[in-house]
Amino acid sequence: MKPWKLLDSEDLVDAPWLKVAKEKCELPNGKVIDDFYTLWQPDWVMILARTKDNRWAMTKQYRHGTQAIMLEFPAGIINKGETPEKAAIRELQEECGFCPPGFIPGSVDADEYRCRNEVRHDNFNADGDRIHNDTCVDPIAATTSCSRMTETEKTSITYLGSFSVNPDRHRGRFHVVFIDDVERLGNTHFDDTEDIETVTLSDEEFQAKIADGTFNHPLQIAGYFKWKLTQK
């Protein structure tokens, strides 16, 4: 089996958060498709944040795509230069006010925490595979940074991998980060378009929400079960 050959590409939408292209492709059998449309959005991360009493930190907010209030795990765009873990820490505090254990909002020692706790800068190849880099770089921004407290907290942040958003025509990926024993220590920092309510659910309550259709975000369900498989 061979990949398609890209013959031409025309940008139809070139916005900061969305790109749409019309591509001309040649299939292995020689057939040419003149108008295959692809989408690109920045990679984003979902955060499976579990409190000390084993409850999931979650959000409720209006989503215009579904025109409904949606129950979700915290999530957000990975900014340029950020690792998925770094983006997860930032988004978790911004949306919910929660921090990983031992983190102090506003601390200037974030780089020390991140290096000593082995949350490192990684890259990804074209197939989405993680390329590990042992060098710690890019300190977490001061507004969401925190300092290292104990050696026992070093395993609280776990990168679980990434998925294609839609293998058919979407070029972006979403990443999954699990953070255990989170604490509500900081203030939230919403964008001017956000109105977010924080809720917590036990694992049993959350699974019931999946079963009854209250929680129906397919990508986040995939991320949750990615974590669930690591518990066996």
Where are each of the predicted segments found?
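The catalytic Nudix box helix
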Residues: M58, F73-F103, T143-Y159, V177, ...
